[in-house]
A protein has these predicted regions:
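N-terminal signal peptide c-region/cleavage motif recognized by signal peptidases
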Residues: 29-31
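Mature, soluble, non-transmembrane domains
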Residues: 110-225
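Early extracytoplasmic/domain-onset interaction patches
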Residues: 37-69
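Sec-dependent N-terminal signal peptides
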Residues: 20-27
Length: 225
């Protein structure tokens, strides 16, 4: 994957470059195609520590059919999907680079931004249809009290990658104290003028630090009594 052709440091860009996928992807779809270019279906689990604090998020990111097809190209035997072991180098490449982009996960409590540690429990799996899912646990740098509302969003600021929560069971709670609940605030639809901006030229001219993806990001809120 690549946010922009001029930004090869993106974690998914490295995967595409290593597997020579970018050329094939854009030859098939046309380089002028508007953002996004990659779609990810998200399921997240808010993980609580034994003391009742929120300790992290466990993500499952299911990639779209086109990315999955390129990711597993040349892997697997006898028509079977590749194993976790075969996909492990690809998982390692992706996750090692995610820190630079804050793991595409932005959490807050009381208006303060929360930081994460390096991901653990990393696996990459391909199902019987060769759809690829990246799973990992993202621990908070410091666990936080569940008695104050905790929120998070999963999105790509440059909107090269579209992250969308699954319709069914998008967010669950693990080991949560009694009475905890989870809700979601959906983003407002883009107005007509904003939709017209979604050209490749618009995104290539982004200034450093620009954040378009937040406009389309669902905010998940966890509240406990």
């Amino acid at each position: 994957m690549t946010f922009r052709f001029r930004q090869p440091s993106h974690p998914f860009t490295r995967v595409f470059l290593l597997r020579a996928l970018t050329l094939a992807l854009f030859a098939a779809s046309g380089a002028a195609r508007a953002h996004p270019h990659v779609w990810v279906a998200v399921r997240s689990e808010v993980v609580f520590a034994p003391d009742g604090k929120i300790m992290g998020l466990r993500h499952a990111w299911e990639f779209d059919e086109m990315y999955s097809a390129f990711a597993v190209q040349g892997l697997g035997k006898d028509g079977k999907p590749p194993t976790r072991e075969e996909l492990a180098p690809l998982a390692k490449t992706n996750v090692e680079s995610l820190a630079e982009f804050e793991f595409f996960t932005f959490a807050k409590q009381g208006g303060a931004k929360l930081k994460f540690l390096e991901p653990t429990e990393v696996t990459l799996e391909a199902d019987e249809k060769n759809i690829v899912t990246l799973r990992f646990l993202l621990p908070l740098q410091t666990p936080v009290s569940a008695q104050k509302p905790f929120s998070f969003q999963v999105y790509d600021p440059t909107y090269f990658v579209s992250f969308n929560f699954e319709k069914q069971n998008p967010v669950t709670l693990a080991r949560a104290p009694d009475g905890c609940s989870v809700s979601a605030v959906e983003p407002k639809p883009l107005v007509a003028d904003e939709n017209k901006k979604l050209s490749e030229a618009f995104f290539q001219n982004f200034s450093p630090g620009a954040d378009f993806g937040i406009k389309l990001a669902t905010r998940v809120i966890v509240a406990c009594p």
